[in-house]
Amino acid sequence: MHTCCPPVTLEQDLHRKMHSWMLQTLAFAVTSLVLSCAETIDYYGEICDNACPCEEKDGILTVSCENRGIISLSEISPPRFPIYHLLLSGNLLNRLYPNEFVNYTGASILHLGSNVIQDIETGAFHGLRGLRRLHLNNNKLELLRDDTFLGLENLEYLQVDYNYISVIEPNAFGKLHLLQVLILNDNLLSSLPNNLFRFVPLTHLDLRGNRLKLLPYVGLLQHMDKVVELQLEENPWNCSCELISLKDWLDSISYSALVGDVVCETPFRLHGRDLDEVSKQELCPRRLISDYEMRPQTPLSTTGYLHTTPASVNSVATSSSAVYKPPLKPPKGTRQPNKPRVRPTSRQPSKDLGYSNYGPSIAYQTKSPVPLECPTACSCNLQISDLGLNVNCQERKIESIAELQPKPYNPKKMYLTENYIAVVRRTDFLEATGLDLLHLGNNRISMIQDRAFGDLTNLRRLYLNGNRIERLSPELFYGLQSLQYLFLQYNLIREIQSGTFDPVPNLQLLFLNNNLLQAMPSGVFSGLTLLRLNLRSNHFTSLPVSGVLDQLKSLIQIDLHDNPWDCTCDIVGMKLWVEQLKVGVLVDEVICKAPKKFAETDMRSIKSELLCPDYSDVVVSTPTPSSIQVPARTSAVTPAVRLNSTGAPASLGAGGGASSVPLSVLILSLLLVFIMSVFVAAGLFVLVMKRRKKNQSDHTSTNNSDVSSFNMQYSVYGGGGGTGGHPHAHVHHRGPALPKVKTPAGHVYEYIPHPLGHMCKNPIYRSREGNSVEDYKDLHELKVTYSSNHHLQQQQQPPPPPQQPQQQPPPQLQLQPGEEERRESHHLRSPAYSVSTIEPREDLLSPVQDADRFYRGILEPDKHCSTTPAGNSLPEYPKFPCSPAAYTFSPNYDLRRPHQYLHPGAGDSRLREPVLYSPPSAVFVEPNRNEYLELKAKLNVEPDYLEVLEKQTTFSQF
């Protein structure tokens, strides 16, 4: 039986068709989604898929590649979008190579901040034709060359703050003809080259936190006629004659153009004062002011100028997807949160991430409105730039702040320097809550009540230099949470309590130089971001790293000079810390005071091994100063000393603060010292030589004795000289007197030894008691040939003696009056002569040579006296005849050893030996060249005693 299929109902058919349609729709949606994603990825590029998130808004793509650890740009690819912002901050880029951005033609904003970029090679920015903003902040750039920014012809905003730039070449910005905003704050610029901004239409320039001392008008300021905002704070301005042109130029521009203050750093007499409050006479007191005045022409109108509000209301530049528009206000320099360095001037971030509008334009003004209320003893003016009242009460002999009547209404700046204020009370500043600057320098403040500044919550600068403050405590700075600059130099501070600076977390500059500090408590700088610290001229011997130095992580300047640093093991940690500082951070040298081997030496030039032989075991953190007891101050400080506005003594005058000596004066002083040293050395040399010669002369004089010369009556030996060629006079005992014979200088009678004085009974010829032996001690050194009677008789048999006449007594020598006293008072009494001898023949030497006795046996008074025939001459030693003309002397003394005494009249025949010896031919006397004295033998019947006394000869002591 045939059965039929059940019929399909209409309902089922509709259900089937609907199911099929849903499947097709789902498949189409999935396919469309896949195709859309693929198209999107292909449209933005690989950089948005793998490396960085991308966001499109208002037709601009923002590519966020921040903090991705990117080392090289080759790790990413350019996005495929017409206009985009590329954010590469917080990476590890250290160098930009040529043509690295050649494919990034769509970039309008490029963030390269917070990298480690040290160099930008020529052509690195080629391809960035559409770039309008470039951020290079927080890198390590040191130089901006002429070709650094080639290819950035459309650049309008350039930020290169927080680098180490010290040199900018003259044409570095020459091709940036559209540049309007230039941020160069917090670098190491000490000057700007001429014509740097000649072709740059700058409207905003930030030069804060550099090392600028001058800004010349010619070549620099004259090209900045379009500037509407200028920031020059935190530079060491030298308020001298050269700054008059800057003062004139600032007076000629809009009142609102200068944001902040130009505060004088030098000279010391103007330290801490605003340039607009210093007169030209104070800037240039001794020169013609007109030579330095360079007034630019006043702009006709301010049309097109964009005026800004003060720095306190400026916004921070941040990354944004908004398109850059010229009418919008450019942002200020930024700082990444992970960077320790901060802005010197506080800047409040804007609520939105875009650009804030410029403030409304104001009419060009050159005079400030008249202030409403001002204390009677002070002068006041209103500053339009910050809408604050400046109260100037300097040098008004004010003894108390309460004397200021009427009270100024909400002053912005108060100058109370050079007064007699001794105490700061808690009620002194109750009505000054808006105070931004308070200058109490160079007063007599020794006491500040606790929380005296508690109401000054907006105070940024506080000057307490040049007072008598001895101790710092946390209560002293209570309420100063906005304080950025604190000047405490030239006080008597000996102690800083722990936590003193906790109430001032925003402190950036701290001057503690020229105090009596010897230690710093642990954690004293905890929580601070100090940029500049001055500890010069204190009593520090070392500073611990742990708890003190290691907390100074944001420093851009520190001064440790002129402290008695003890360069031993305790300072090794500080040395290592100093060596890790970047170039330019340490202001001056760190000179060792002890130990002596390192004195006046820079600590950095000494190896750690020399400072501490076992420095590897030394802990980097030296003992904390809390354990060091601060002794009483060693130097007395006179309370009546007046200090000038810098805190230095007022007696120093304009240049009193300069401790260095001018180079010309130093060179002249060194030259004078050198010349004096030469003269002193020459004088000492001459003195030493004279003393040496005197000592030698004294030694010679002690070995000399005076011997009197005398004339002896004698007869000339016969013969005319014999065959020997040497004439010997033959003595005749009878016959006519012969004329005087002139003997040579070496005749024996000119050589009279000292003991001849004993032939006379005059006491002047006697030897002094106790020196009878010493007088003849050196006789053997003369080596004079002598012979006894016994030897002569053996050599030649004398002729039979003639009849001897009656012997005449020996002649008595007479002294001139005063001769005895003269001999007693002087050792050198007669011209000095040298005695030369010739070695005698060995067969003529006497066997009786003795150092303790004088010549013996020379002329023995024997009984066998004989005469020598006429014409017969002895070969060497002629014997004296026993004639009346010959004298035989019998000594009346006995020559003994040193322990014996002389006794006249001794009976021993040995003692009757005469002291006169026969003349050896080898003995002669040579007079000195300075004196000439020829002794002549005279043939007289009686001796000439006056001539005997005049002709004296000095011989070496025997």
From Swiss-Prot:
Glycans are attached at residues 103, 644. Residues 686-958 are cytoplasmic. Residues 1-40 form the signal peptide. The keyword Transmembrane applies. Keywords: Glycoprotein, Leucine-rich repeat, Membrane, Repeat, Signal, Transmembrane, Transmembrane helix. Gene3D superfamilies: Ribonuclease Inhibitor. The keyword Transmembrane helix applies. Residues 235-286, 563-614 form the LRRCT domain. The chain crosses the membrane at residues 665-685. Residues 41-664 are extracellular. Expressed predominantly in the cerebral cortex of the brain but also at low levels in the spinal cord and medulla. Residues 797-812 have a biased composition (Pro residues). Residues 365-407 form the LRRNT domain. GO terms for biological process: adult behavior; axonogenesis; chemical synaptic transmission; circulatory system development; dendrite morphogenesis; grooming behavior; positive regulation of synapse assembly; regulation of trans-synaptic signaling by BDNF, modulating synaptic transmission. It is a single-pass type I membrane protein. GO terms for cellular component: glutamatergic synapse; plasma membrane; postsynaptic density membrane; receptor complex. Residues 317-358, 789-844 are annotated as: Disordered. LRR repeats lie at residues 82-103, 106-127, 130-151, 154-175, 178-199, 201-222, 410-431, 434-455, 458-479, 482-503, 506-527, 529-550. It is found in: Membrane. Belongs to the SLITRK family. Suppresses neurite outgrowth. This is SLIT and NTRK-like protein 5.
